[in-house]
A protein has these predicted regions:
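Substrate-binding pocket helix/loop in short-chain dehydrogenase/reductase
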Residues: 99-100, 107-112, 216
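Residue(s) in the substrate-gating loop at a strand-loop-helix junction
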Residues: 143
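Alpha-helical segment proximal to the catalytic Tyr-Lys
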Residues: 128, 172-173, 244
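Short C-terminal tail/terminal secondary-structure segment
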Residues: 2, 148, 236, 247-261
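Active-site helix of classical SDR
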Residues: 123, 159, 167
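Conserved glycine-rich cofactor-binding loop
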Residues: 17-18
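Short, small/polar-rich loop/turn modules that mediate ligand/substrate recognition or access, typified
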Residues: 175, 180, 246-248
Length: 261
């Protein structure tokens, strides 16, 4: 998708420093948006801003989506620099891996807090901007794990199902407010998160890195891993004027994985 389809719009992307978040922020900037890069670590955010330029982007560090006051302060700063928020991408996530019997409460709660509570807090703070304009896009980065089950990631699966539930509820609630709310559900994607999953497979099975990657790629009927840019393209489409009638949907970017299952 090309052209300045987001010109003069303000997009806020959480978890923007690396992986899918960085690809989404880059796509929004190339589409003409002013982009607030939100995250907890300054270095990757600053590096991305260096690539995209400071005129079109701002960095929101210490943006902990589970902390109500930090969310409120970060969004206030975003507004002061770039004005009301038109497009929100809730990308920040947490994906712990462990057998269910060894998953402690703290781990389970953290997955819910980052994935579900984070999307709730940030969306609640941003939505008044959209209601005032009678226009806005909320795009939640979920996962195929929000639609089907996977072993050894029960906390993540439960959390991503929650994200899709929140998406569907808000889509109905805001249907007459000019706001669309959708989820994008990537399959296994070439990101630092995937690298950690590969490391975990290697540690537990002693298999080679190539074999571990092949195992993850095999879940995709196309026989490959998804790229962050492919996920970003789906987000950009949902943020575009042409997607005004698309709301409450979970768009799968996984080469047919969920359909095949």
């Amino acid at each position: 998708m090309t052209g300045q389809i987001l010109k003069d719009r303000h997009a806020l992307v959480t978890g923007a420093g690396t992986g899918i978040g960085a690809a989404i922020a880059t796509a929004c900037a190339k589409a003409g948006a002013r982009v607030s890069l939100a995250g907890r670590r300054r270095d990757p955010l600053a590096a991305l801003q260096g690539k995209l330029g400071s005129a079109q982007t701002q960095v929101l560090t210490d943006f902990d989506v589970t902390d109500e006051e930090k969310v409120r302060a970060g969004i206030a700063l975003a507004r002061r620099e770039f004005g009301p928020i038109d497009v929100l991408v809730n990308n920040a996530g947490e994906a712990p891996s462990a057998p269910f019997a060894k998953t402690d409460l703290a781990t389970f709660n953290k997955a819910l807090a980052v994935n579900v509570i984070g999307a709730f807090l940030v969306t609640r703070e941003v939505v008044p901007d959209m209601i005032a304009k009678h226009a806005g896009r909320v795009i939640n980065i979920a996962s195929t794990a929000g639609l089907i089950g996977y072993a050894y990631v029960s906390a993540y699966v439960a959390a991503k199902h929650g994200v899709i539930g929140l998406t569907r509820a808000l889509a109905i609630e805001f249907a007459r407010s000019g706001i669309t709310v959708n989820a994008v559900c990537p399959g296994f994607t070439e990101t630092p998160l995937l690298d950690r999953a590969v490391d975990n497979i290697i540690a537990k099975t002693k298999r080679s890195r190539d074999d571990a990657r092949a195992t993850l790629a095999a879940t995709n009927p196309q026989g490959r891993l998804v790229t962050p840019e492919e996920v970003a393209d789906a987000v950009l489409w949902l943020a575009s004027p042409g997607a005004h009638s698309i709301t409450g949907q979970a768009i799968v970017v996984a080469g047919g994985e969920v359909m095949a299952g």
